[in-house]
Structure formats: structure tokens, C-alpha cells
A protein has these predicted regions:
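Short Pro/Gly-enriched beta-strand edge/turn motifs at strand-loop
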Residues: 1, 49-55
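Beta-strand-rich interaction surfaces with strong enrichment in secreted/lumenal proteins
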Residues: 4-7, 16-20, 110-118
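Short, well-ordered beta-strand segments enriched in hydrophobic/aromatic residues
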Residues: 16-20, 24-45, 123-131
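A short, structured loop/turn motif at beta-sheet edges
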Residues: 22-27, 73-78, 118-121, 134-139
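Acidic/polar low-complexity flexible segments
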Residues: 48-50, 59-66, 74-80, 137-186
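Extracellular/luminal beta-rich ligand-recognition
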Residues: 53-110
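Active-site/ligand-binding surface loops and adjacent short beta/alpha elements
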Residues: 100-120, 178-181
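Extended, acidic-biased charged interface segments
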Residues: 109-150
Length: 186
């Protein structure tokens, strides 16, 4: 698993690890949350052993609370997708033609699956989506794993890499992982 780091380097008792796996066109993104003091808001009570699937209704502004994210970018162009989901099975996907240039006409038609469980007493979330319908995504692609947490210490921004003077998951310098068919992180 990939350990995510807070931008602010706050003294929190939280650790977040993430991973991804592409098998054919099925992308599974997973997050393991170590929050023994249950500091996260809008996350507890954590409902383990839960599975929800189908064409779920996407929601806006998930990043205003605890939200798990993955960014998938083409290696040749600046097109990229941003997936957001939370422990309540709320999700969304956005398409950008370039840095922060959201294509408003993009309407996701994706079958998604969210599953939750406990791993050694810690919350584990997995989000699976068939990426075949993401026409502008070409493999191999670049990946940025990220999380926004809202807790007792306020809002924190987590990623495997932070490059700028402020947290910016869209910054292409943070897309440091590779997505290839039938492979996970590299």
C-alpha cells in the first residue's frame, strides 16, 4: 500500500494508506484508515461489511468532508479524470481537458461498486469501476492518490506527493504513479 502524507504535517493520530489495481478494464482503488481515536468527522460510525453496486447517483462537493480520491491522467495529453467517493457510498467522477479545466458536459455513465470492511480493526474501503467508458483515458496513465479529511484538527489534504506551496491534487507534478493494464502501482 502507498502511504499518504498530509500537506500541513499536522500532528494527527491518523494514517491513510491507499492502493489501486487495474484488471482488464476494472479499476479497484482501496484505502486503509488508521484512526484509532476516531478523529474523522462524517466517517463514523463506520459501517463494515457493506457492499453497494450499480449505476449510483453521483454527488457534488464530496471534498468538503472526508473524501477519498484518485486522479487518472493521460501521459501524452493533459486530459485527466478525478474520482471522489466516501464511506457512505457517495461518489462522483469529473473529466478535465487540461489543468483544472472541467468539462461540464461530461456525464458519467459508470457502474460502480463500493465495499467496506475492517482489516485488523481499521476501516478499509474499496471502490471498483469499469473504466472502459472513459474514452479519453489512454494507458499507460499517470495516477495521483489523494484524500481530504475533516476531523478534530480541521481539514487535511493527503497525497503520495505534494509539490506546490499549497495543496493541489490537480498539479501534474503530483501524478507520480503509473496505471497500466493488469498492474497496480509502480
Amino acid at each position: 500500500m502507498i502511504l499518504l502524507y498530509t500537506f500541513e504535517n499536522k500532528k494527527e493520530n491518523i494514517r491513510i494508506s491507499s492502493d489501486f489495481q487495474l484488471n482488464g478494464s476494472m479499476l479497484t482503488v482501496s484505502y486503509l484508515v488508521d484512526d484509532k481515536d476516531q478523529e474523522l468527522e462524517d466517517f463514523y460510525p463506520f459501517e463494515a461489511a457493506r457492499e453497494i453496486s450499480g449505476t449510483l447517483f453521483p454527488l457534488e462537493n464530496l471534498w468538503t468532508t472526508t473524501c477519498f480520491e484518485i486522479f487518472l491522467k493521460n501521459t501524452v495529453t493533459n486530459d485527466y479524470y478525478e474520482f471522489n467517493f466516501n464511506s457512505k457510498a457517495e461518489w462522483n467522477v469529473f473529466y478535465f481537458s487540461d489543468y483544472r479545466k472541467r468539462v461540464e458536459s461530461f456525464k458519467p455513465d459508470l457502474d460502480v461498486k463500493l465495499s467496506t470492511r475492517q482489516v485488523n480493526g481499521r476501516p478499509f474501503l474499496a471502490f471498483t469501476v469499469d473504466i472502459r467508458s472513459l474514452a479519453n483515458l489512454k494507458l499507460p496513465g499517470q495516477v495521483n492518490m489523494a484524500t481530504v479529511t475533516k476531523g478534530k484538527a480541521g481539514i487535511s489534504y493527503w497525497s503520495q506527493k505534494h509539490s506546490g506551496q499549497k495543496p493541489d491534487f490537480h498539479d501534474f507534478k503530483n501524478f507520480s504513479l503509473i496505471l497500466n493494464s493488469n498492474e497496480g502501482k509502480k
